[in-house]
Amino acid sequence: MNNRYYQLNKNLIPYKLGCYIPFVVLGDPSIEISLEIIYSLIKNGADGLELGIPFSDPLADGPIIQQANLRAFSANITLTKCFEMLFKIRTHNPKIPIGILIYANLIFKLGIQKFYSICSKIDIDSVLIADVPIEESFEFEQHSIKNNIDSIFVCPPDASKNFLKKLSKHSTGYIYLLSRSGVTGIDMKITPPLKNFVKELKKLTSIPIIQGFGISNENQIKNIILSGVSGVICGSVIIQIIANNLNNKKIMLKKIKKLSNRFKKATII
């Protein structure tokens, strides 16, 4: 629906590049440093952004991202402040695709119509609602269509053919392919390259397939891109750098810059 993801994929394919999309939680460890981190990621290889809206009970996330949510709340983050940050990020870079990951309660509390209207005004590209399955997504989808915002749904690596058909019908922007079942994190093994699975999924959809969950090194990224997906989403490994360097912003930003450049280079096939 929103053409930034389509344009990104179209621009990268001729050069045999996959896209690299980092994930961080807005407001972690503070609003000011969070913005510095995001601007650094944009400058150092990020093709798109996936940004988490802090939530008190993030069921889809492992301990690393849960702690990031807690740090953001300690910095007094609110949904309103998240929108203000997103506006600054969009103003900073009008071209980069920006997706947000959010939990349904936050949308209900604000109001579905108002939420999507604000996202549209900020020029957000996509919304992934972590705890709303396709079967319960109708009302959200209607508002996303009305506001020209892509609906992102996750695809487990063991999904049935019936689910893949449903997924291809409802997904816009891209399909978020999970490396494995469970929660986010960097300590657990990811599923081996899903080449045959990706091949079957591509028969049903032409939108980009982007893989995330547990991706923490260049070899994983290279193998994932070679399996036929369009790109990777990497979060926990970046957020761990934030957690390990809370008392030294300079080192934190230096390590994130280095990692981001390495990960982008790994998408070259």
UniProtKB/Swiss-Prot annotation:
Pathway recorded for this protein: Amino-acid biosynthesis; L-tryptophan biosynthesis; L-tryptophan from chorismate: step 5/5
Name of protein: Tryptophan synthase alpha chain
GO MF entries: tryptophan synthase activity
Enzyme superclass (EC): lyase
EC numbers, comma separated: 4.2.1.20
Subunit structure: Tetramer of two alpha and two beta chains.
Function: The alpha subunit is responsible for the aldol cleavage of indoleglycerol phosphate to indole and glyceraldehyde 3-phosphate.
Family statement drawn from the similarity comment of this UniProt entry: Belongs to the TrpA family.
CDD domains recorded: Tryptophan_synthase_alpha (cd04724)
UniProt keyword Lyase, yes or no: yes
Catalytic activity: (1S,2R)-1-C-(indol-3-yl)glycerol 3-phosphate + L-serine = D-glyceraldehyde 3-phosphate + L-tryptophan + H2O
Residues of the active site: E50, D61
Record keyword Lyase present: yes
Keyword terms of this UniProt record: Amino-acid biosynthesis, Aromatic amino acid biosynthesis, Lyase, Tryptophan biosynthesis
